[in-house]
């Protein structure tokens, strides 16, 4: 009986290791530039489902945030409200041009690349040609670094080298 009990305990322990996820497993996710938009006459950020090579309407707000997301942590929109009137209200409309609000949020220190400093947010009204796309608006304000596929890797030199890397989820972002 003692031998049967010992075998049962060992078998249970082995099965538990196989079928129960270890508590020490690390959650992973991606650190990247997230792209958000707010259509004219709205102030709600919506995650862009296409890249910045789309036409944008006069009165829209374009938002970029250096963010983290994974299975356990959703990405977050820029921390500045997408309020066109607040961003561009003092900028007069010009014939043949459009006004676009631009927000660039460099994210949080908790997921900043090692050795790099999070920059100050950029909130600016951009007056641009009617045919300008999101990437044109962004490029009027700061230097854009892209990879060969067009993925935005760096804005204003941040981050300096990486491009959409997988990292361990910062503990401060995980639900407790």
Which sequence ranges carry the predicted segments?
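Bacterial N-terminal signal peptides that target proteins for export
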Residues: 1-9
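Ubiquitin-like/PB1-type beta-grasp interaction modules and other compact soluble beta-rich domains
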Residues: 3-4, 17-176
């Amino acid at each position: 009986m003692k031998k049967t009990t010992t075998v049962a305990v060992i078998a249970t322990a082995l099965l538990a290791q196989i079928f129960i996820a270890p508590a020490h497993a690390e959650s992973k996710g991606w650190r990247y530039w997230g792209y958000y938009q707010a259509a004219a006459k709205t102030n709600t950020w919506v995650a862009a489902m296409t890249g910045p090579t789309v036409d944008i309407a006069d009165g829209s707000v374009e938002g970029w945030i250096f963010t983290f997301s994974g299975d356990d942590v959703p990405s977050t929109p820029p921390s500045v409200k997408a309020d066109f009137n607040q961003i561009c209200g003092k900028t007069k409309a010009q014939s043949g041009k459009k006004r676009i609000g631009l927000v660039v949020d460099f994210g949080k220190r908790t997921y900043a690349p090692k050795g790099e400093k999070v920059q100050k947010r950029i909130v600016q009204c951009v007056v641009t040609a009617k045919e300008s796309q999101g990437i044109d608006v962004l490029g009027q304000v700061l230097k854009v670094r892209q990879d060969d596929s067009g993925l935005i890797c760096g804005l204003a030199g941040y981050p300096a080298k990486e491009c959409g890397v997988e990292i361990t989820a910062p503990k401060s972002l995980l639900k407790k």
